[in-house]
């Protein structure tokens, strides 16, 4: 149990700080998680959440029950300031028994998932298959169902296909079938948020988007019928979950680590974003436990964790929280999220997607160097996709989103599919993510200034 | 186009034979496929079969239509002896809207596929989760639904779980839920053949078998309801497809390469076994084309290709053919099948699963050496699973089943799932399989004796 020996040595010696990162502090925290008493605790914490409540769709009982269950556990853990804050007017969309059927050249019920937010609609029309987005500008799509059969180039590059409703509707299209956003499939379409336009729209499995592509290349006329029963319902109120480790010197300066609790209505939302929640919880639990053993470990600034609601619906929960707090007396010093797979980083292709200025970036580099010294390979990369913490990032608060190497590709095997289950995580995945989030939170809560 | 140069050189020079394998002959054939005019032709041949007819379930119109389409194409190709032979009394099973629902500890419609051959049944009972088959002998399963949540160790090792109905019924079990037979899943259960017993039985997705396993380990009582609507119907008659390249010296001695045309009622049966068919067709086409260019390339024995029906139902089509022909005047000299993924071999973990005596095995080794010299890594391995050609293998006819390295594991990502689509094949997969099957057929059709 080398972490115990290390802790004893640490308690007997002053922290040795080079730059603003104290490597002993990072070592204590990461060893406590990866090889010490906290090992596997995040995964164990996650199990009853996803197994007992299942997926947690916004405006559904399973989400609100899961929120209650989580708050109760956080109170038992003894965190500071455990509470929920209401997020009113949340989008309420319910999936129905939707069908999309290829009628010609042969009858085949297609393997689809309706895109979130679409209202009931029926349409039968000829389909045109486009292998690239820009072809909408040179192809007659008027009166047609547009089928996108793009090559996977990455989620953020390809999301325009799923969100094309408004643009293709303006060109006269009567329906949208977008190839699912992922690099690999076993008959597994992906859902996700779409446009507000009431154009019938669904994601096709990779296999069947490619089938339609091949049929079109052989000059077959494709006739497709779309029958959407899904619908929007009156808005609901949901809740964000907040819990703190109160800062000893600057309690009103907040270092934020976060993940989201809501999910789509498929699988059990373990990957997206139960694993993120578990890593955030584990990081918080470890900082609290180490602080109880050694008061010097307690943070100077407040470390706050938030489990957002309504992430899957345009970050609606986080945006509401931001609006409520942006003019408050608390100052957000740093914000972060983990929502692209709480995976173990195995190469320095694992990144902290960072927004901030040059000085701040240099500090991130120091943190990353310290993580590397503790066998956590990772690098800093500029990027502007910060998910739920985007509002603060846009405000100039330094921000990070953790993306493991597996988060760039493997994550999208399962994202928004029926395959989003706890077994995606391998031993250590959540531990490593917790070690990264905990290190960020702890180091930044204690530095003098940005 | 080095194959043309090679062909010219070959035509001008006598075959150089070391042992019984003529390496020039193998090189001509493999180059013609892998880098010559036949490149990609198998994959192109397969496309309309799977895209225009879809899956091809026994006793369904799509199978018989696909048989007619295939026969017509073979006739146009000019093969000898193109015909079908009826296989009567074939099992006729139709999947219904089957549901399996977890009632306690929470309500969840489980992600299942009924096991083939099961008749309508309804049962609600407590479930017991077993992580290993042998636990049926030490666990009280009387009145219970048995859920198997085994670790994947391989298809042939684990198939006992799917076929456990008879045995667990004898112990008083009232239902069977078997974890799907595969190493990896994206919410993708696998179907397959089961037992004849009328015990309600279905395959669970990996994810949900593991979910039930975790709930049981946390001492939750599991209550499950099974409602099977699938049913057996009166038997039907289907057809095997036979086509030859007639032997020039020993036409009544048959060298057989084969694959099966029927599939389960999911996906499009491209992997299982459209790819096998395409490779067999491509091998036959190439041998015929090379023989037209150079008469010396024509086989001395008859090379026969068969596309079996009813493979998915206990090899019923092949067994019928065997019974009809075992006492005929034709002598089966060698039999083979490709039905475990028509993939490119990338390592010598790719095998010819071989049954035969020591002398025959030595000859297989020579063929394999020649394939290796032509950049096709493969090895010979003893094994007794020869699929549709098992009857001949059991009779002592030397036999081979081709299993690429990807056939051991990756194949079972898709096997009997909704993900069995043409896109599984990468560039070259079917070409390489055709090169192997073609080499086996051609070399063995021309050797003096075993």
Q: Where does each model-flagged region fall?
A:
Chain A
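Alpha-helical metal-binding/catalytic segments enriched in His/Glu/Asp
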Residues: 75, 241, 257-315, 437
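N-terminal signal peptide
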Residues: 10-22
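His/Asp/Glu-rich mid-to-C-terminal helical/loop segments that flank catalytic regions of hydrolases
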Residues: 285, 410-450
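Soluble metallo-hydrolase cores and metallopeptidase-like ectodomains found primarily
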Residues: 25, 105-109, 114-138, 191-270, ...
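N-terminal capping segment at the start of a domain
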Residues: 20-60, 186-194, 262, 334, ...
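Noncatalytic luminal/extracellular "stalk/propeptide" segments of secretory-pathway proteins
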Residues: 31, 35, 47-145, 150-152
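Extracellular/luminal Protease-associated
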Residues: 60, 109-200, 268, 378
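Metal-dependent peptidase/peptidase-like ectodomains
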Residues: 107, 265, 308-412
């Amino acid at each position: 149990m080398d972490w115990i020996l290390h802790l004893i040595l640490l308690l007997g010696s002053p922290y040795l700080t080079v730059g603003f990162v104290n490597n002993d502090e990072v070592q204590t925290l990461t060893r406590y998680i990866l090889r010490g008493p906290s090992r596997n605790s995040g995964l164990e914490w996650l199990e009853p959440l996803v197994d007992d409540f299942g997926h947690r769709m916004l405006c559904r009982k399973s989400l609100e029950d899961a929120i209650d269950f989580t708050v109760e556990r956080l109170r038992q853990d003894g965190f500071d300031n455990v509470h929920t804050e209401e997020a009113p007017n949340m989008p309420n969309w319910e999936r129905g028994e939707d069908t999309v059927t290829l009628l010609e050249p042969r009858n085949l019920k297609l393997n689809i998932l309706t895109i979130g937010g679409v209202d009931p609609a029926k349409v039968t029309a000829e389909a045109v298959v486009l292998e690239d987005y820009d072809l909408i500008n040179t192809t007659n799509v008027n009166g047609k169902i547009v089928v996108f059969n793009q090559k996977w180039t990455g989620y953020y590059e390809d999301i325009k296909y799923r969100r094309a409703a408004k643009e293709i509707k303006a060109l006269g299209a009567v329906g949208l079938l977008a190839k699912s956003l992922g690099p690999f499939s076993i008959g597994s379409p992906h859902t996700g948020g779409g446009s507000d336009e009431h154009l019938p729209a669904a994601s096709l499995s990779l296999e069947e988007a490619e089938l339609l592509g091949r049929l079109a290349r052989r000059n077959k006329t494709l006739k497709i019928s779309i029958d959407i029963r899904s619908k929007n319902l009156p808005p609901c109120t949901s809740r964000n979950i907040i819990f703190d480790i109160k800062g000893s010197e600057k309690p009103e300066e907040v270092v934020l680590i976060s993940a989201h609790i809501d999910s789509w209505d498929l699988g059990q939302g373990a990957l997206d974003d139960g694993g993120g929640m578990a890593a955030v919880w584990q990081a918080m639990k470890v900082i609290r436990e180490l602080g109880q053993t050694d008061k010097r470990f307690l943070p100077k600034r407040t470390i706050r964790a938030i489990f957002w609601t309504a992430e899957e619906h345009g970050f609606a929960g986080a945006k509401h929280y931001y609006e409520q707090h942006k003019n408050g007396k608390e100052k957000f010093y740093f914000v972060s999220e983990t929502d692209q797979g709480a995976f173990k980083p195995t190469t320095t292709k694992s990144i902290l997607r960072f927004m901030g200025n040059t000085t701040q970036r240099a500090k991130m580099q120091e943190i990353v160097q310290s993580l590397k010294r503790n066998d956590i390979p990772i690098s800093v990369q500029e990027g502007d996709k910060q998910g739920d913490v985007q509002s603060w990032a846009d405000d100039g608060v330094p921000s990070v989103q953790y993306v493991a190497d597996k988060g760039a590709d493997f994550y999208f095997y399962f994202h928004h599919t029926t395959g989003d289950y706890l077994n995606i995580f391998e031993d250590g995945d959540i531990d490593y993510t917790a070690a990264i989030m905990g290190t960020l939170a702890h180091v930044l809560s204690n530095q003098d200034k940005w």
